[in-house]
């Protein structure tokens, strides 16, 4: 029996305990985890520093190091987000739909856990806690497979959480970590159909495409974020500058940050110098089309086809001047990843057209794409941003970690 199969067996054995746990017991487990994270802050930071030191030695970019880093403020924020989960309604057992048929049958559509969830993700250790606690609240067992970049942080966080859930009478194996960081273990996890009910990848295009291509377990695809802001000819320029700045520089290494800026030709000469002066403060590299280079000069690197389709996750942005809202929509359709897209405009007609015709999980008018987030949408923490159309789309909160069961009650009806 392999190591991965052993994890699957343990998760399946623990599944019933969490699936049938009361709301009070689940909330007590979450509170115990929240407290344990605060109590172990110094040790968590110490283990995280080992990962950060390795990241520096390996030449990891500053933006990606920021994704990896845990400090006292971030640990406290994660702890508080867990407490937010305890305040949220327990979706398990809730009724989506109910009816009484003409023959007297009472039919209800009820929410139940998915079962055992596998999650494969990269270098963000906060995902370890977010994913585990969301799965717990939704009544699921979880097997986590983090990236090797965050190995020490993840082992520490998992051990803290496993000890915490045991204090409230739940089995530690409702939360497990694959401590083998090899590609072989990832491939085996993708094929663990006997024990996993669903697999959720979180990370870059390479990881997600590999999971989609190789998994035999059902997959919920979460998003590569090649996101756009389109500045329409009627846009409020100051608003457009502020939205672009926030969407690109506030945290460039996350999937809801923009990678492309599209600007209507009639506003480009006024807008582009203003947005460049703001982006320059963050040392953002601009890769622009020929028209962009004509307006902004030699400081702009000429963009090629690849740039418009790249999720940089860094202080780099591709810029294109377009002739119309139709061209902007076509560009998004060609290069976008169905994640988050934005139009800045005063035109109600263009706003409605953009929201109607752009195919994405979240389509914004006059607001930053950085809001595509479970907390910001009022769902609590999220497991990821789904960019597919089956089962779930957009930020995946508690409800998206459940499925349905039909409950039918009769008094002897036969067909």
Per-segment meaning from a language model:
Residues 1-107:
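N-terminal Rossmann-like NAD(P)+-binding subdomain of aldehyde/semialdehyde dehydrogenases
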Residues 2, 123-126, 130-137, 167, ...:
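ALDH superfamily catalytic-core signature
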Residues 21-27, 169-175, 250-257, 285-291, ...:
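Flexible, glycine/charged-enriched surface loops at secondary-structure junctions
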Residues 87, 96-238:
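Rossmann-like NAD(P) dinucleotide-binding subdomain of oxidoreductase/dehydrogenase enzymes
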Residues 115-119, 133-134, 140-142, 173-176, ...:
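Structural motif
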Residues 304-415:
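Conserved C-terminal structural/oligomerization subdomain of aldehyde/semialdehyde dehydrogenase
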């Amino acid at each position: 029996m392999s190591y991965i199969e052993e994890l699957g067996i343990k998760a399946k054995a623990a599944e019933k305990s969490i699936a049938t746990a009361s709301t009070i017991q689940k909330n007590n487990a979450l509170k115990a985890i929240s407290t344990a994270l605060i109590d172990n802050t110094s040790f968590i930071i110490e283990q995280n520093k080992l990962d950060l030191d390795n990241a520096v030695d390996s030449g990891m970019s500053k933006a990606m190091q920021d994704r990896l880093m845990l400090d006292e403020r971030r640990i406290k924020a994660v702890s508080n987000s867990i407490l937010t989960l305890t305040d949220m309604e327990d979706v398990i057992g809730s009724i989506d739909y109910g009816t009484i048929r003409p023959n007297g049958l009472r039919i209800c559509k009820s929410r139940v856990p998915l079962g055992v969830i596998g999650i494969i993700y990269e270098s963000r250790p906060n995902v370890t806690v977010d994913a585990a606690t969301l799965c717990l609240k939704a009544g699921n067992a979880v097997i986590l497979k983090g990236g090797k970049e965050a190995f020490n942080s993840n082992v520490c966080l998992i051990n803290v959480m496993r000890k915490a859930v045991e204090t409230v009478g739940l089995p530690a194996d409702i939360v497990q970590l694959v401590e083998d960081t090899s590609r072989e273990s990832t491939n085996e996890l993708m094929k663990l159909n006997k024990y996993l009910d669903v697999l959720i990848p979180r990370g870059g295009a390479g990881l997600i495409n590999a999971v989609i291509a190789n998994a035999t377990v059902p997959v919920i695809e979460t998003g590569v974020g090649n996101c756009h802001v389109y500045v329409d000819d009627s846009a409020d320029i100051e608003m457009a500058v502020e939205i672009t700045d926030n969407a690109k520089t506030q945290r460039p290494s996350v999937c809801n940050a923009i990678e492309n800026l599209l600007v209507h030709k009639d506003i480009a000469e006024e807008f582009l110098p203003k947005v460049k002066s703001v982006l320059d403060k963050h040392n953002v590299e601009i890769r622009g089309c020929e028209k962009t280079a004509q307006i902004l000069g030699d400081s702009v690197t000429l963009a090629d086809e690849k740039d418009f389709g790249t999720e940089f996750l860094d202080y780099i942005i591709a810029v294109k001047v377009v002739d119309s809202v139709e061209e902007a929509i076509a560009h998004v359709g060609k290069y976008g990843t169905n994640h988050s897209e934005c139009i800045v405009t005063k035109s109600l007609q263009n706003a409605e057209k953009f929201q109607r015709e752009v195919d994405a999980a979240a389509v914004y008018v006059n607001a930053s794409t950085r809001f595509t987030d479970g907390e910001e949408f009022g769902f609590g923490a999220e497991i990821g941003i789904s960019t597919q159309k089956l089962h779930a789309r957009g930020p995946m909160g508690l409800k998206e970690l459940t499925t349905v069961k039909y409950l039918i009650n009769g008094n002897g009806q036969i067909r």
